[in-house]
Amino acid sequence: MISVYSISLGCPKNRVDTEWLLGVLGPEVRPVREMADADLVLINTCGFIAPAVEESVRTVVEAVAELEDLPRRPLLAVAGCLVGRYGRQDLAAELPEVDLWLTNRDMDAWPEMIGRALGVAVHVPPVRLLSTGPSYAYLKVSDGCGHNCSFCTIPSIRGGLVSTPADVLEAEAVNLLSRGVKELIFVAQDVAAYGRDMGLRHGLRSLLDRLLPLDGLERLRLMYLYPAGLDAGLLRYLRDAGKPFVPYFDIPVQHAHPDVLSRMGRPFARNPREVVDRVRDVFPEAALRTSIIVGFPGETQQHYDHLTRFVQDVRFMHLGVFAYRAEEGTPAAGMPGQVDEVEKDWRRDALMEVQAEISEEILEGFTGSDEDVLVDAAHEEWPGLHVGRTWFQAPEIDGVTYISGPGVKPGAMVRAEIVESRTYDLVALS
């Protein structure tokens, strides 16, 4: 039996990597809640932006300090984007207490490195150790990125696009569904680009052809769809496919003004409203999510006002707004017209206030309706209350539906009436 204390920072793709890494240690893995009880302490880091780097470094330093006081010191392994961005050698010089540094680019070697350090046999292919509960799981369909946005560090950290073969993903999906998972969520740096590195023109459609008919799959959700890849043909395919696909579209437009988009090096720089209209032409009731960066170098008040009007006009159901931070080694960090930090934060907060009103109005429209709620977990504080999600709520990043009543338990799909709405959350009774 191997006791593991794990921390996964950053995006769902990191969570999948953590689950996979724990899976290579085989069926004898036992997750623990305290470092003192662990044989292995695993920290999977994020290095995408400066605040994530700071959080990752702080987490590692705090772990080192806690381990120093233990009578029996577990193995400390640090993996992920922080290692890929700054390199083993430099990090090891600063933090020699870490036993293993693991980069995403040598992920295939992780099993051997971990197994050798622990003195255990590894299991390849592994069975993922799920950390998301019984209801949903992420399926990472590719790694790396083929785009070159001027603000982004991902290509330098994770490399170019590498799609996972469809037969491997199908086998993983079958395994996850056999364990009771009801919702699969595709994640990648750009899900719409799946298969391009393999020479496939319609790679995502080919993958969906294999996965949508699988027994036990009740929801399939696509995240991280770059605007340029969401063409009319793919949308028609998704419409014709129907359930279990849910018409939830996560489309990171990043900005709305063509001047800013051009400096960002973004595809679809002319008018992101075109892709919104394209989706709504095929799916009038689609749930739309996007992410926005404010305060990008050269963003004027006029650019920001244009962006605000865009958000007000489109009325995204879900919106994430981030203040631009200059990342070392990116073209944008050296661009003229850097915006004052206080101004960037003000623009972010003001745009989120606009979105809060939009979200509240949209969710109020669901009051009195019946929706299928996938129950994720029991509420941590209120007995009898559970936390779940409708089809238009993705885990971890969107609001939730608080639900109670007959048949409500983790992993269940329950028909329920929406009885109350809040700014970002719903309340339902089965």
UniProtKB/Swiss-Prot annotation:
InterPro entries: Elp3/MiaA/NifB-like_rSAM (IPR006638), Methylthiotransferase (IPR005839), Methylthiotransferase_CS (IPR020612), Methylthiotransferase_N (IPR013848), Methylthiotransferase_N_sf (IPR038135), NA-bd_OB-fold (IPR012340), Ribosomal_uS12_MeSTrfase_RimO (IPR005840), rSAM (IPR007197). It is an enzyme of class 2 (transferase). It comes from the Bacteria. Residues 364-430 form the TRAM domain. [4Fe-4S] cluster 2 binds at residues 145, 149, 152. Its EC number is 2.8.4.4. Pfam families: Radical_SAM, TRAM_2, UPF0004. It catalyses: L-aspartate(89)-[ribosomal protein uS12]-hydrogen + (sulfur carrier)-SH + AH2 + 2 S-adenosyl-L-methionine = 3-methylsulfanyl-L-aspartate(89)-[ribosomal protein uS12]-hydrogen + (sulfur carrier)-H + 5'-deoxyadenosine + L-methionine + A + S-adenosyl-L-homocysteine + 2 H(+). One of its GO terms (biological process) is tRNA modification. SUPFAM superfamilies: Radical SAM enzymes. It is found in: Cytoplasm. Residues 2-119 form the MTTase N-terminal domain. Its main location: cytoplasm. Residues 131-361 form the Radical SAM core domain. Binds 2 [4Fe-4S] clusters. One cluster is coordinated with 3 cysteines and an exchangeable S-adenosyl-L-methionine. GO terms for cellular component: cytosol. Keywords: 4Fe-4S, Cytoplasm, Iron, Iron-sulfur, Metal-binding, S-adenosyl-L-methionine, Transferase. Transmembrane segments: none annotated. PROSITE patterns: MTTASE_N, MTTASE_RADICAL, RADICAL_SAM, TRAM. GO terms for molecular function: 4 iron, 4 sulfur cluster binding; aspartic acid methylthiotransferase activity; metal ion binding; protein methylthiotransferase activity. SMART domains: Elp3 (SM00729). Its cofactor is [4Fe-4S] cluster. Catalyzes the methylthiolation of an aspartic acid residue of ribosomal protein uS12. Belongs to the methylthiotransferase family. RimO subfamily. This is Ribosomal protein uS12 methylthiotransferase RimO. It comes from Oleidesulfovibrio alaskensis (strain ATCC BAA-1058 / DSM 17464 / G20).
